[in-house]
């Protein structure tokens, strides 16, 4: 694990919890947004929780699996290769699935109704083994890079706000 001071920090005061994004992951998301990609893209979030299980550390936002479907306003994440990747991450680093990420090209990073519905399905589906999934959306506001981070917990949504390290 890198030093938490070298990561982007997002805070939710209601839950008294934080989500940290490793700088290399943050820079990669920034590059994807700057490239002005025309189609939505995305993947899964990999990382871990600290000892208190209160703060999440995001170590990777994967590329889209090869069987994903991307259009201008929709991204359907595929599954090809994810099972073996997650097994490898768990065995090598004790890292695991934390949630989903995707890009809203040229648009706000606020979650759509579809985004919220999909995350609630993940939260309540035992196959995902993720009762508190994180949704990370990359977008822009006033032509500036912006990330929305939402934790889904007990059928509620908790938004995280960027904070100083």
Language-model features: where?
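Histidine-centered divalent metal-coordination motifs
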Residues: 102-104
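Conserved beta-strand-loop surface patch within small alpha/beta domains used
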Residues: 1-97, 106-165
